[in-house]
A protein has these predicted regions:
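Catalytic loop of short-chain dehydrogenase/reductase
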Residues: 1-16, 22, 26-29, 44
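C-terminal helical subdomain
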Residues: 30-42, 57-102
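Short, flexible catalytic-loop segment of classical short-chain dehydrogenase/reductase
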Residues: 1, 38-51
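Short, hinge-like loop/turn segments at secondary-structure boundaries
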Residues: 52-56
Length: 102
């Protein structure tokens, strides 16, 4: 979770979600409930996203490779998180495409 110029309203809500997840993890962990905070920092390659790009004059197939995330890759990350052993739970996971510029 990163704050950035021009994104104060967005960032404050995202930081609030992170705090909520931290509190829930501490509260529910003793009951063997794994709470994790995930950040999906990219567009997801769905027909909805592709249509919005076309409306903006962008042809999705012309985007650089790995710009949009494959929904199956996101699902696998969630699945792997779900199957973690309690002695090695992940609390926070950032999922982003290789092509993202830092």
């Amino acid at each position: 979770v990163r704050g950035s110029s021009g994104y104060a309203a967005f960032a404050s809500g995202k930081f609030a979600l992170r705090g909520l997840a931290q509190s829930m993890a501490r509260e529910l962990g003793p009951q063997n409930i794994h709470v994790a905070h995930l950040v999906i920092d990219a567009g997801v390659d769905t027909e909805f996203v592709r249509e919005r790009q076309r409306q903006a004059g962008i042809e999705p197939d012309d985007l650089p490779l790995d710009t949009l995330m494959n929904p199956d890759s996101i699902a696998k990350a969630y699945w792997d998180l779900h199957h973690q052993s309690r002695d090695g739970w992940t609390f926070e996971l950032d999922i982003r495409p290789f092509a993202e510029t830092w």
